[in-house]
């Protein structure tokens, strides 16, 4: 539990935003 978990969450959020933007 540390920066690795936070980076994982940020990565997932980035992918979600990317998909959301691309979908529009």
Curated annotation (Swiss-Prot):
Source organism, top-level taxon: Eukaryota
Coiled coil: none
Keyword annotations: Copper, Oxygen transport, Secreted, Transport
Subcellular location: Secreted, Extracellular space
GO cellular component: extracellular region
Expressing tissues: Hemolymph.
GO MF terms, alphabetically ordered: oxygen carrier activity
Spans traversing the lipid bilayer: none
Family of the protein in this entry: Belongs to the tyrosinase family. Hemocyanin subfamily.
Cited function: Hemocyanins are copper-containing oxygen carriers occurring freely dissolved in the hemolymph of many mollusks and arthropods.
Record-given protein name: Hemocyanin subunit 4e
Source lineage: Eukaryota, Metazoa, Ecdysozoa, Arthropoda, Crustacea
